[in-house]
Regions:
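Membrane-proximal helix-loop-helix units in multi-pass membrane proteins
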Residues: 84-123
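Membrane-interface helix-boundary motifs at transmembrane edges
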Residues: 2, 64-75, 121-133, 179
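Interfacial helix-loop-helix junctions of multi-pass membrane proteins
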Residues: 27-34, 91-103, 151-164
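Small-polar-interrupted transmembrane alpha-helices in polytopic inner-membrane proteins
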Residues: 74-90, 136-144
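Interfacial helix-start motif at the membrane-water boundary
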Residues: 38-57
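Alpha-helical transmembrane segments of multi-pass membrane proteins
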Residues: 13-29
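Terminal transmembrane helical module of multi-pass membrane proteins
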Residues: 127-179
Length: 179
């Protein structure tokens, strides 16, 4: 299962590298107010497709690890739906498929948030309370950031925080569940 840990974590890192590099490559991009999906609009936009696929790979690999550990089919399916939605959002760019893209990103975050809620219940570890605190804490932070992003935080900042929270969750539990 060590190779699965490396795939999940490596895919999360690939997402970070892709999106961070696009911040520097795309001319005129405003990370404070523009959504991350808008990184796909410039001349190097294809990198964003690979970033979305890397994010989907990270989440689906974690789903597979969790399913192998505890056999929880509900959590497995929820995370796979989230991963598929992220992949779909990469395939359907925001400039051409605006409505579908936004719905896919929304559904992906909802499914991953639900996964954050469900995960501690299926882990049979001696540190179940610790797993719950981490998973539910990050899930709560995700929900809070979404709400604040709708009310007072600029959209670009809110979305980056949401992505960072999701990536932290994936990396922490890819590491914790495969040791």
């Amino acid at each position: 299962m060590t190779y699965l840990r490396l795939i999940a974590i490596g895919s999360a890192v690939a997402f970070l590298i892709g999106t961070i590099s696009l911040h520097f490559l795309q001319p005129g991009y405003d990370p404070v107010n523009q959504l991350m999906s808008e990184l796909a609009l410039g001349p190097y936009g294809i990198i964003m497709l690979f970033a979305f696929i890397a994010l989907a790979s990270s989440i689906s690999t974690l789903a597979f690890v969790i399913w192998r550990l505890c056999g929880n089919i509900t959590l497995h399916v929820v995370l796979l739906i989230g991963a598929a939605c992220f992949a779909g959002a990469g395939i359907l760019p925001i400039d051409v498929f605006n409505g579908a893209h936004i719905i896919l990103v929304f559904c992906a975050f909802v499914m991953c948030g639900l996964g954050m809620y469900l995960l501690p219940g299926c882990l049979n570890s001696s540190s179940k309370a610790h797993d719950r605190m981490i998973s539910w804490g990050l899930g709560g932070m995700l929900v809070f950031t979404v709400i604040v992003g709708q009310v007072s935080l600029p959209g670009g900042i809110a979305q980056r925080l949401e992505a960072a929270i999701l990536l932290m969750w994936v990396v922490v539990f890819a590491w914790r569940t495969t040791r």
